Amino acid sequence: MALEPYDPCPCGSSKKFKFCCQPIIEELGAVERLIAEKQPKQALLAAEKLEPEHALNPLLLRNKIMAFLMLERQQEVLTLIRQLQQAHPQDPYGYYFDIRWHLFMSDWESTRPLVEEHLTFIGEKNPALAYQVAIEVVDELLNNGCFMAVWRYLFDALLWARSEDDARHVMSAFHELNKSNDIPLPFRNLYQLRALPENQPNQAEFAEVMQVANGRHWNQAAQLFEALSEKDPHQPVLSFNAGLCYAWSGDLAAAAELLGRAGDDLPDFESAVELETLAQLHDQQLPEVQIPLQTYRYRVQSVSRLLSQLDQEQRLHRQPLPPERPDVDRPPAAVYLLLDRPRNSGTADDLNSLPVSIGTVLILDEVRDPAAPGELYVRSLIPAFTDADHELVVRVAGEQIDVTAADGWGLLPSDDGIPRDVAGLNFNIVPPPGLRRSEILKLVNAHARHVVFDKWTQLPLESLDGMTPAEAARDPELHMPVCAAINVLASVTETANYSLNVDELRQHLGLPAVEPMVCQTSEELKLSSIQDCLRLAFNEVPAEVVRDAFPMLASTRAIHPLRKLLDAIYDREISIPEFDVPAVCRMACSLAIRVLDLDAAQMWCERGRAANLRVGADLVARADWDLNELEVAALSNNEEKVIELLRKCAREYFLKIPQTKQQILQLLKLERLDSPRVQAIMSGTDLQTVGAGISDGGLWTPESAAASASGGKLWVPGQD
């Protein structure tokens, strides 16, 4: 839409268009088009025509900054940013570019003051610009492990989103981060600053600090809250708010100290455990408490020959490749686990004999571009990885890799590390060959339980001042930090796909059982943390609280609390919007299978089938429940039940739902179920299945080919 002479000028100044940029709007438009077309040099030439008369025009300065950014001429960028800020102090773009420049050229410690000083101002002037800043800050904070700050800035980005696409992008980011096992569960929450009780001193000073925090000056607010806490050292609200603001500012060390101090002063045990958990998790993100991990990179002469050599090494275990993603330019040619011993050396009877992975080997295929040869990466996973392990890979690769020292090759600089308190834990076993899937699942769970209950409990922890959890649990004064250490451990086991039952481990160590939480309204629930929701007393809270807790807990994938929630939903007949009873049963069955509680899985199969009958389910839904029950029977090694269900599926589903047969074949392959009876059913030669089908009028046989050709309803299971 064309601008009128007396419209506000698009440059953002307080002047009217006629008295500001109208005389040069066409020339400015030409510069902007060249920037959009990624022609920065031509854009700068076009901009020169407007100088020196219009050298300080804000639109011209913005476009010149963009051009120099594209040319990576950072010093000129900074000079122009300073000109824009000095000539137009109310232009949010000056501060936006300043923050972007520091994010690219400096570290978070140097960038944080700029963000906290100017972001709220940018949001008031140009919310869309503030949205961009918040999203870029999120990327930086993720790289630094400042996960509570990530949630804070994502929430602010959602407030500043001015389009449906931007809002969807933020919600998608929340969804992806909630699914990430790399982010400990207690961090997946937006905590709120707490109000000071009315009967406490320092009310006026507290209100002033809250105003500072409302302006998103997190570090300044944290220091002021901390100063107030020194006046009233046993008021947990002050130290909690200080710790929370430090966490939002990305100061992990200060956040750990203040949140831990707040936990010490809380009378409620579970709330104290929650804050101590946050403190320990922040501590573990600090570089000084992490053991560095190593990554090596080498040029490959011939990828195919290299793979042939690596396949022969018994301490390398080749992994199935994931499906290729369209956004990946160079998908891996192969991935290997580097094991601590030969891959076939362990036995299922001796958990300590099983090989565990201590590193990974990644090979990227060569491409036609000579600047992109084949590459081999060797990466350590745990501190047990030594120089000898690295040398093993180099020796096996032999002449197929170039070990000549050069920039960007050999040992790569890296900030990656693993916290000392979990460095001695390794859940990544390689099961012996020839096991069924159910046997592998049981072995993996048994090994993970062995690592947690037998090894971790005897491991000296820095968070417990060098004591083991078993020792600390015997001292009532240390119950709170030990329970917090268990919560931290649960976040580690989640990355290994082992769902730790926190209450069970507490009881094993003689610690207090997890105290259930009861809240009477959805508003109370909204103010609760993720950790609080995990201990909800689902049978004692109103139905509306259960309904609102469901999406929150479902997103956490915390198996044991989620199973309790689903039990309560079913027992109390609570309706979950857009989530019917069969769906509840399906999720509960899946979770029961995940933890190998096969009796519960069978019960949920029966409940789900009954629920489907009540709502008049179609054939596909009925088939799904039979497939679920078949999986449970296979995992239970109940061959008679497997045969019964296979015959039923062959009679009722193979013709009408062809994919059913493929799903069953995959299950049978995983479970190594290939007895003659199973083969007969799947090949269509099982006489009982054939006979039952004839009585139903549903079989095809060679003798009835003519009837089939004339449209008869005749078919043999397995006949395609």
Which residue ranges define each predicted feature?
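Alpha-helical segment of the N-proximal tetratricopeptide repeat
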Residues: 26-79, 97, 136, 140, ...
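Short Lys/Arg-enriched alpha/beta "domain-start" segment
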Residues: 276-359
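Short Cys/His-rich zinc-binding micro-motifs
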Residues: 2-15
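Solenoid-like repeat scaffolds
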Residues: 18-19, 48-55, 82-90, 117-127, ...
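TPR/TPR-like (Sel1-like) alpha-helical repeat modules
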Residues: 86-92, 103-107, 113-124, 142, ...
